[in-house]
Structures are given as structure tokens and as C-alpha cells.
């Protein structure tokens, strides 16, 4: 009986340590969470999905872009404005900016890389009226705002500035909303 009691005591002591160890909390370093945003005093707020969007222009054969002014098929994208109050502003235009192709203020230059970039091609943006949007601080055509959510449509094309050569053809533009 005494041996059984001692065996039970030893077993209990050993398993108690295991049970305690199994329930111990382990904490490791994680990372940083960046919260990004802005409080605005304007007619609308830009939807978070419109901040950093990617417009996929796809693959276009260089043969299609072999002369100055040749274009690819247009690809649509929108800039969405939320919580709009048409009493504050009746309309909005979008101002795009970015590096323009030399001599063409309405064609966005491609990002240059050491090797592998397409040449003699850029990106051109048109607004909801079909008007080409310059990159010089001029706003797109005014879009009439309604209360609530507004989706302002645009289109982008590859635009040849000469005989295009094959390669990566990425470009970046920033935008601002100009309320009118």
C-alpha cells in the first residue's frame, strides 16, 4: 500500500509538471501594423480600394504599337468616392500626375529599369467623356456628384511614341480629387 501511494505521488508530481508546462503561454515578437488614412474636409472621401490600385493592361503585341499614336485596347478602371454630399460640391475632377514622355504631356512614361523595359511606349488615360487627361495638373472633365457613392470611370491604353520594342511596360501615376 505504501509503495502504491509513493508511486502515485511520484506519477502525480511528474504529470503535474507536464500539465503545467503544456499550458504555459509563449510570446514571440510579431511585427508592426501601420494604420494609414486621412481625415478630410471635403465633399467626399476616396474609397480605400481606389488608393493603391493596379490596372492590368495585359500583353500587347509590339506590332500593334509600331507607329507614333498607335494604341492598345482600352482597359477601364474607376476612382470611387464615398459618403459624398452634393450640397458641398456638385462635381469633381481627377488630377493625375506622373512623369510624362518627353514632348507628350498626356502620355505617362514607363518606369525605367536597367534592362528589359519596353521602349517608345507609354500609358494614356481618358476620362468618362473620352477626353485625354493631361499629366500637367489639369483636372479631368467634371463628373457630376450624387449623394452617397460615386464611381468615376476612366480608361487606360498603351500609347506608342514610335515603334515600340518588347519589354516590361509598367507606369505609375498619382491622383488628387479636385472638387468644383
Curated annotation (Swiss-Prot):
Q: Which residues form the signal peptide?
A: 1-23
Q: Does the keyword Signal apply?
A: yes
Q: Where in the cell is it found?
A: Fimbrium
Per UniProt, the keywords (alphabetical) are: Disulfide bond, Fimbrium, Signal
Q: Which GO terms describe its cellular component?
A: pilus
Q: Which is a GO BP term held by this UniProt record?
A: cell adhesion involved in single-species biofilm formation
List the InterPro entries hit by this protein, alphabetically: Adhesion_dom_fimbrial, Adhesion_dom_fimbrial_sf, Adhesion_dom_sf, Bact_Fimbrial_Adh_Pro
Per the UniProt entry, the disulfide pairs are 44-84
Q: Which residues cross the membrane?
A: none
Per the similarity annotation, which family is this? Belongs to the fimbrial protein family.
What is the recorded name of this protein? Type-1 fimbrial protein, C chain
Task: Please report the organism this UniProt entry assigns to the protein.
Answer: Escherichia coli O6:H1 (strain CFT073 / ATCC 700928 / UPEC)
Q: Which gene encodes it?
A: pilC
